[in-house]
């Protein structure tokens, strides 16, 4: 386990041991392909190189980077190697000041221009504009600017779901959903070592690296990660995506730490999901995107995941009219059938019709005695300057 650091003087922090620092080095120096659209070449980057390049250029542009952190499942992987969550997300957090729109735009331009450094040799860079780079390599751009949240996200595209996500945070109200995804590892000491030390790291000679749990209690969160336990704080603050993450934990054999409180947690998450995604098409897009990003190489787990999600929605949704709830359940069922069809387990199910018993709603003129499940509605992904945060 990471050892408690006396210099951190807080329950939320801990010093990484050599095994964890060594694993962190592997994550930061692993080559990750960033796939270009069309005829654009694949960029081969490491997290170490992209962090050093972006941080240096931000400082040159007058935006001070207070620290850089590894976040999400990659941080969890560093702390506990075989934790059941894998290491799909490569999330980096840059702590910066974003007082106005100008800083948001400057951060975006710096990241896009930094990508020029990673183009293969022989590629002419003279006529490649930031707009062109955005269309070629950016999977997602998000900007949030409210009283309690000021941050932006730039996601570099990887067709296998290992997007490199660069998050620039001024302030953010909540940085985690569950204790097991609350870890952040501060990279500055290791980055300093890369810049100035000529000696290779060893068990007896390596920088002190601090890990922090946004959950507030590092040892408790670490225990939850080791033992696959689901716990959180202030569940009413969890946004709509928390329901999808919770179901993801369940399909990976995590279990609730407190079985008495879990039903309340499930009701909170279901309610928030339908608040954030009230339209059936929004729900479909969110679910399909989540499956693509989190189960790209786990086709056999998709069906189990959707069935768990369906059970939770069926048992814990209290904020919807009956027909709205059934419409969402039907959507999840159709996605599950589609997954089975793609695995050649059953015939294609894009025109399955689901029949309902209409008795409780027969007096409702808007109620139909059957619901025809149309094929999934096609939609084209666009890449505007900024996407709203969901």
From Swiss-Prot:
The record's section on Pfam families has: NTP_transf_7
Gene responsible for this protein: TENT5C
User: What's the EC number here?
Assistant: 2.7.7.19
Q: Which InterPro entries match?
A: TET5 (IPR012937)
Q: Which residues form a coiled coil?
A: none
GO cellular component, as recorded:
centrosome; cytoplasm; nucleoplasm; nucleus
Q: What name appears for this protein in its UniProt entry?
A: Terminal nucleotidyltransferase 5C
Return one Gene Ontology term, BP aspect: mRNA stabilization
Localisation per UniProt entry: Nucleus; Cytoplasm; Cytoplasm, Cytoskeleton, Microtubule organizing center, Centrosome
Any one GO MF annotation of this record = RNA binding
* Natural source organism: Gallus gallus
Function summary: Catalyzes the transfer of one adenosine molecule from an ATP to an mRNA poly(A) tail bearing a 3'-OH terminal group and enhances mRNA stability and gene expression.
Q: Catalytic activity annotated for this protein?
A: RNA(n) + ATP = RNA(n)-3'-adenine ribonucleotide + diphosphate
Q: Which family does it belong to?
A: Belongs to the TENT family.
């Amino acid at each position: 386990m990471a050892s408690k650091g006396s210099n951190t003087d807080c329950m939320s922090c801990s010093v990484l041991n050599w095994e964890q620092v060594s694993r962190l080095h592997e994550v930061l120096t692993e080559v990750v392909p960033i796939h270009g659209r069309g005829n654009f070449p694949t960029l081969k980057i490491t997290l170490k190189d992209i962090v050093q390049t972006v941080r240096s250029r931000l400082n040159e542009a007058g935006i001070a980077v207070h620290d850089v952190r590894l976040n999400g499942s990659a941080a969890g992987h560093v702390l506990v190697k075989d934790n059941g969550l894998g290491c799909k997300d490569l999330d980096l957090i840059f702590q910066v000041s974003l007082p106005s729109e100008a800083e948001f735009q400057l951060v975006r331009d710096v990241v896009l221009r930094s990508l020029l450094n990673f183009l293969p040799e022989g590629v002419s860079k003279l006529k490649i504009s930031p707009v062109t780079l955005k269309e070629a390599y950016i999977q997602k751009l998000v900007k949030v600017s409210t009283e309690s949240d000021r941050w932006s996200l730039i996601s570099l595209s990887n067709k296998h779901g290992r997007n490199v996500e660069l998050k620039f945070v001024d302030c953010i109200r909540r940085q985690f959903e569950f204790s097991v995804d609350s870890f952040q590892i501060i990279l500055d000491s290791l980055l300093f070592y890369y810049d100035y030390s000529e000696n290779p790291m060893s068990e007896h000679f390596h920088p002190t690296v601090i890990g922090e749990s946004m959950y507030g209690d590092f040892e408790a969160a670490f225990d939850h990660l080791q033992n696959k336990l689901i716990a959180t704080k202030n569940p009413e603050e969890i946004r709509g995506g928390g329901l999808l993450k919770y179901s993801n934990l369940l399909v990976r054999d995590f279990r609730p730490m407190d079985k008495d409180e879990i039903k309340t947690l499930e009701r909170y998450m279901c309610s928030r999901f339908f608040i954030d995604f009230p339209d059936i098409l929004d729900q479909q897009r969110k679910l399909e995107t989540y499956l693509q990003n989190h189960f790209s190489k786990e086709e056999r787990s998709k069906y189990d995941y959707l069935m768990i999600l369906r059970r939770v929605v069926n048992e814990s949704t209290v904020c919807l009219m009956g027909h709205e709830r059934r419409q969402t359940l039907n959507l999840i069922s159709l996605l599950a059938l589609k997954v089975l069809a793609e695995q050649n387990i059953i015939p294609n199910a894009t025109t399955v019709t689901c029949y309902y018993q209409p008795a409780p709603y027969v007096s409702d003129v808007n109620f139909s005695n059957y619901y025809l499940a149309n094929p999934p509605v096609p939609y084209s992904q666009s890449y505007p300057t900024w996407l709203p945060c969901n």
